[in-house]
Regions:
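Aromatic- and glycine-rich beta-strand/loop motifs that create alpha-glucan
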Residues: 1-26
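Transmembrane helix boundary and interhelical loop/hinge segments in multi-pass membrane proteins
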Residues: 16, 65-84, 213
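Selective transmembrane-helix segments that form parts of the transport pathway or gating/packing helices
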Residues: 89-117
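A structural motif at transmembrane helix-loop-helix junctions in multipass membrane proteins
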Residues: 129-165, 211-213
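Hydrophobic alpha-helical transmembrane segments of multi-pass membrane transport/permease proteins
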Residues: 20-42, 55-64, 163-174, 194-202
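Junction motif at the cytosolic side of a transmembrane helix
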Residues: 118, 196-213
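Transmembrane alpha-helical segments of integral membrane proteins
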Residues: 141-147, 169-180
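Secretory targeting signals
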Residues: 112-136
Length: 213
């Protein structure tokens, strides 16, 4: 299973390098959202300091929508999705896709957070790194599951925003609080950890059924 997992992950990275679909759709969107938010909330440094962490996490949450379309979109377009899910074990396919999406969301979080630090002048507390790692993992599990669920039909893809955004709210809230100054760390760290564990286990458990859709 491990060899299949990393084979799927390497394939995802190779596909992204060749097409740069996620890069082209995500980076300009995140940059535009952060810049526009800075213009809307500014120019008061106090207002920017309050809204900065939430802006970064909102960008990450909304970025799950275009990223979810890349989970199985290439295989469906090439008519290779049926062959892939027939040859690769469901667990290996899930975790290989998950690692690829997690990498994309982690880079998105780093980009959004870096822009917020530069443009908003918001410091980075140490606990925000934990929130970023665990929160993006939870969102990656959601994105992988919903990406596979909606890959087989155009009508289903229209439901992505309605499914992903509400389901990702705990990561948005906990990540924002962990990136904010003078906020109790432990309750939010526990929340994002439990949320990530529940989402990861649930997505893994239902993934074989999603492959049959």
């Amino acid at each position: 299973m491990t060899s299949q997992l990393f084979a799927v992950f390497r394939r995802e990275i190779s596909v992204e390098r060749a097409g740069r679909e996620a890069l082209v759709t995500t980076v300009p969107f995140v940059a535009a959202l952060v810049v526009l938010a800075g213009l809307a909330f500014g120019p008061s440094p106090r207002d920017l300091a309050v809204t900065g962490p939430g802006t970064a996490w909102l960008a990450v949450l909304v970025a799950t929508i275009p990223l979810s379309r890349t989970v199985a979109g290439t295989e469906v377009a090439e008519d290779s999705w049926d062959a892939l899910r027939g040859l690769v074990a469901p667990g290996a396919l899930f975790f290989g896709k998950l690692l690829a999406v997690w990498s994309g969301l982690a880079l998105t979080w780093l980009l959004a957070g870096g822009l917020v630090v530069v443009l908003f002048g918001v410091p980075v507390p140490p606990q925000s790194l934990y929130g970023g790692a665990v929160g993006t993992l939870a969102l990656a599990a959601l994105t992988t599951g919903f990406g596979v669920l909606t890959a087989s039909g155009a009508r289903r893809r229209g439901l992505l925003a309605a499914l992903l955004l509400p389901a990702g709210l705990p990561a948005l809230l906990a990540g924002t609080q962990l990136a904010s100054a003078k906020v109790p760390v432990l309750p939010w760290a526990v929340l994002v950890t439990l949320y990530a564990a529940v989402v990861l286990v649930a997505a893994w458990a239902v993934f074989p059924a999603l492959l049959e859709e």
